[in-house]
Amino acid sequence: MKFNEKLVLNSYLLSLFGVSSFEELVKDLKASRLEELDENDNSLFYHQLKDNLIEKNKLINDDELLEYDENIVRHTKTMGRDIKWKYFQYLSLLFVEIYLDKYFDDKEQLLEDLNTYLREFNTNIEGKEKLTEYKHTELNKLALYNATGSGKTLLLQINLLQFNHYAKDKVKINKTV
Protein backbone atom coordinates (compact mmCIF):
# COMPACT_ATOMS: atom_id res chain seq x y z
CA MET A 1 0.00 0.00 0.00
CA LYS A 2 1.40 3.39 -1.00
CA PHE A 3 2.02 6.03 1.66
CA ASN A 4 -0.55 8.45 0.24
CA GLU A 5 -3.17 5.71 0.48
CA LYS A 6 -2.62 5.45 4.25
CA LEU A 7 -3.46 9.06 5.09
CA VAL A 8 -6.51 8.32 7.20
CA LEU A 9 -6.83 11.74 8.83
CA ASN A 10 -6.64 13.42 5.43
CA SER A 11 -9.28 11.04 4.09
CA TYR A 12 -11.46 11.64 7.16
CA LEU A 13 -11.24 15.42 6.74
CA LEU A 14 -12.13 15.12 3.06
CA SER A 15 -15.14 13.01 4.03
CA LEU A 16 -16.43 15.89 6.16
CA PHE A 17 -16.82 17.80 2.90
CA GLY A 18 -18.59 14.89 1.25
CA VAL A 19 -15.72 14.12 -1.13
CA SER A 20 -13.33 11.20 -1.39
CA SER A 21 -10.29 12.89 -2.94
CA PHE A 22 -8.37 16.13 -2.68
CA GLU A 23 -8.79 16.63 -6.42
CA GLU A 24 -12.56 16.45 -6.03
CA LEU A 25 -12.47 19.08 -3.27
CA VAL A 26 -10.23 21.52 -5.15
CA LYS A 27 -11.67 21.24 -8.65
CA ASP A 28 -13.55 24.55 -8.27
CA LEU A 29 -11.05 26.28 -5.96
CA LYS A 30 -8.07 26.90 -8.23
CA ALA A 31 -9.13 30.24 -9.75
CA SER A 32 -6.95 33.11 -8.53
CA ARG A 33 -10.05 35.34 -8.15
CA LEU A 34 -10.96 33.20 -5.10
CA GLU A 35 -7.89 34.50 -3.25
CA GLU A 36 -9.82 37.68 -2.40
CA LEU A 37 -12.18 38.60 0.43
CA ASP A 38 -15.77 39.74 0.02
CA GLU A 39 -17.24 42.94 1.51
CA ASN A 40 -17.79 41.13 4.84
CA ASP A 41 -14.19 39.90 5.04
CA ASN A 42 -15.08 36.33 4.21
CA SER A 43 -12.86 34.52 1.76
CA LEU A 44 -14.21 33.65 -1.64
CA PHE A 45 -12.91 30.13 -0.95
CA TYR A 46 -15.51 29.93 1.82
CA HIS A 47 -18.29 30.92 -0.58
CA GLN A 48 -17.10 28.47 -3.21
CA LEU A 49 -16.99 25.61 -0.71
CA LYS A 50 -20.35 26.52 0.80
CA ASP A 51 -22.09 26.92 -2.54
CA ASN A 52 -20.58 24.01 -4.46
CA LEU A 53 -20.43 21.15 -2.01
CA ILE A 54 -23.41 18.85 -2.08
CA GLU A 55 -25.34 19.55 1.11
CA LYS A 56 -26.55 16.00 1.64
CA ASN A 57 -23.03 14.54 1.45
CA LYS A 58 -21.10 16.95 3.63
CA LEU A 59 -20.79 16.52 7.38
CA ILE A 60 -19.58 20.04 8.11
CA ASN A 61 -22.26 22.69 8.28
CA ASP A 62 -22.15 26.17 6.80
CA ASP A 63 -21.99 27.88 10.21
CA GLU A 64 -18.89 25.88 11.16
CA LEU A 65 -17.33 26.60 7.79
CA LEU A 66 -18.02 30.31 8.26
CA GLU A 67 -16.48 30.29 11.75
CA TYR A 68 -13.36 28.55 10.44
CA ASP A 69 -13.08 31.02 7.58
CA GLU A 70 -13.46 33.99 9.93
CA ASN A 71 -10.69 32.58 12.11
CA ILE A 72 -8.38 32.10 9.12
CA VAL A 73 -9.04 35.66 7.91
CA ARG A 74 -8.56 37.12 11.41
CA HIS A 75 -5.30 35.24 11.96
CA THR A 76 -4.07 36.24 8.51
CA LYS A 77 -4.78 39.91 9.21
CA THR A 78 -2.89 39.57 12.50
CA MET A 79 0.24 38.97 10.42
CA GLY A 80 -0.01 42.58 9.25
CA ARG A 81 0.65 41.81 5.60
CA ASP A 82 -1.51 41.60 2.52
CA ILE A 83 -1.49 37.81 2.30
CA LYS A 84 -3.52 36.10 -0.38
CA TRP A 85 -3.68 32.37 0.15
CA LYS A 86 -3.54 29.91 -2.70
CA TYR A 87 -6.22 27.21 -2.58
CA PHE A 88 -3.85 24.57 -1.19
CA GLN A 89 -2.65 26.95 1.55
CA TYR A 90 -6.20 27.89 2.48
CA LEU A 91 -7.20 24.22 2.69
CA SER A 92 -4.19 23.44 4.85
CA LEU A 93 -5.31 26.17 7.26
CA LEU A 94 -8.92 25.02 7.06
CA PHE A 95 -8.01 21.41 7.85
CA VAL A 96 -6.02 22.60 10.89
CA GLU A 97 -9.01 24.69 12.02
CA ILE A 98 -11.31 21.69 11.81
CA TYR A 99 -8.90 19.37 13.60
CA LEU A 100 -8.11 21.79 16.43
CA ASP A 101 -11.78 22.61 16.92
CA LYS A 102 -12.69 18.94 17.21
CA TYR A 103 -9.64 18.15 19.35
CA PHE A 104 -10.19 20.90 21.91
CA ASP A 105 -13.97 20.66 21.90
CA ASP A 106 -14.26 16.90 22.55
CA LYS A 107 -11.19 14.66 22.25
CA GLU A 108 -13.17 11.54 23.05
CA GLN A 109 -15.65 12.23 20.26
CA LEU A 110 -12.81 12.95 17.86
CA LEU A 111 -11.17 9.65 18.81
CA GLU A 112 -14.45 7.79 18.32
CA ASP A 113 -15.12 9.49 14.97
CA LEU A 114 -11.61 8.80 13.68
CA ASN A 115 -11.68 5.15 14.73
CA THR A 116 -15.14 4.65 13.26
CA TYR A 117 -13.83 6.11 10.01
CA LEU A 118 -10.67 3.99 10.26
CA ARG A 119 -12.65 0.77 10.65
CA GLU A 120 -14.50 1.58 7.42
CA PHE A 121 -11.22 2.63 5.80
CA ASN A 122 -9.68 -0.75 6.75
CA THR A 123 -12.44 -2.76 5.06
CA ASN A 124 -10.67 -2.31 1.72
CA ILE A 125 -7.24 -3.26 3.09
CA GLU A 126 -5.90 -6.76 3.48
CA GLY A 127 -3.87 -8.44 6.23
CA LYS A 128 -0.75 -6.73 7.53
CA GLU A 129 -1.58 -3.53 5.69
CA LYS A 130 -4.58 -2.83 7.96
CA LEU A 131 -4.03 0.26 10.06
CA THR A 132 -4.34 0.19 13.84
CA GLU A 133 -6.88 2.32 15.64
CA TYR A 134 -5.90 5.66 17.05
CA LYS A 135 -5.10 5.99 20.74
CA HIS A 136 -6.05 8.99 22.85
CA THR A 137 -2.36 9.81 23.35
CA GLU A 138 -1.79 10.10 19.60
CA LEU A 139 -4.35 12.82 18.98
CA ASN A 140 -2.08 15.62 20.20
CA LYS A 141 0.19 15.21 17.17
CA LEU A 142 -0.66 16.65 13.80
CA ALA A 143 1.61 16.38 10.77
CA LEU A 144 1.15 18.47 7.67
CA TYR A 145 2.69 17.84 4.29
CA ASN A 146 3.18 20.76 1.95
CA ALA A 147 5.46 20.91 -1.07
CA THR A 148 8.68 22.89 -1.29
CA GLY A 149 7.90 26.54 -1.93
CA SER A 150 4.33 26.27 -0.65
CA GLY A 151 4.72 28.85 2.12
CA LYS A 152 5.18 26.43 5.03
CA THR A 153 6.87 29.03 7.26
CA LEU A 154 3.98 31.45 6.85
CA LEU A 155 1.45 28.66 7.33
CA LEU A 156 3.20 27.59 10.52
CA GLN A 157 2.91 31.11 11.90
CA ILE A 158 -0.84 30.99 11.31
CA ASN A 159 -0.97 27.44 12.76
CA LEU A 160 0.48 28.80 16.01
CA LEU A 161 -2.26 31.44 16.13
CA GLN A 162 -4.83 28.74 15.42
CA PHE A 163 -3.49 26.57 18.22
CA ASN A 164 -3.49 29.47 20.68
CA HIS A 165 -7.08 30.30 19.71
CA TYR A 166 -8.39 26.80 20.38
CA ALA A 167 -6.13 26.00 23.35
CA LYS A 168 -6.96 29.20 25.22
CA ASP A 169 -8.11 28.38 28.76
CA LYS A 170 -7.90 24.63 27.97
CA VAL A 171 -4.21 23.82 28.29
CA LYS A 172 -1.21 25.38 29.91
CA ILE A 173 1.06 26.46 27.09
CA ASN A 174 4.82 26.16 27.45
CA LYS A 175 5.95 29.69 26.59
CA THR A 176 9.53 28.61 25.82
CA VAL A 177 8.59 27.46 22.33
Located regions from the model:
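N-terminal helicase ATP-binding lobe
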Residues: 1-177
